[in-house]
């Protein structure tokens, strides 16, 4: 029997550009802040109320590199990971933080298009290098024009009434059920 399930699924918006760093063994670690919001109507006032929750997300390995390269402030993404609480001591006071860990068992998927604050003319995504360097925008390439495809003649709609096959299910009343 399983001892428990530790699984978190979030769909949210990045609150800042991700921070990428590399461990001594060369593995990437990316930290980001993800916002999720819920909305409801207050029964007493009739006003719409919105609450935003901020989540700390740490990604490891290849998914961390991808997040660091493609996610930006305002990007929407799907995160699937696990909760983990860390403890440390600072100035004699124990401190705790709970974060979502996305490692080899987790998932990160980019959603939607480019963030709304990006300009139309350039490529908003980092072309490599570290996050400390300024990002350069690559010139936008246009697709070659293709001639329109010739139109195909319309095909008649399928006639589903002409099927005379029997329904491929067994009749449950044909069998003797021996239940004891």
Curated annotation (Swiss-Prot):
| Comp. bias (Polar residues) | 115-131
Domain of life per record = Bacteria
The processes (GO biological process) annotated in the record are: DNA replication
Instruction: Kindly give the InterPro entries that the UniProt entry links to this protein.
Output: NA-bd_OB-fold, Primosome_PriB/ssb, ssDNA-bd
Give GO MF terms, alphabetically: single-stranded DNA binding
Pfam family example for this protein?
Answer: SSB
Gene3D superfamilies, per the entry? Nucleic acid-binding proteins (2.40.50.140)
- UniProt region (Disordered), positions on chain: 111-180
Question: Which keywords does this Swiss-Prot/TrEMBL entry list?
Answer: DNA-binding, Plasmid
**SUPFAM superfamilies, A to Z:** Nucleic acid-binding proteins
Record note on quaternary structure: Homotetramer.
Record NCBIfam families: PRK05733.1, ssb
Protein's name in the database: Single-stranded DNA-binding protein
Q: Which organism is it from?
A: Pseudomonas putida
Q: Which gene encodes it?
A: ssb
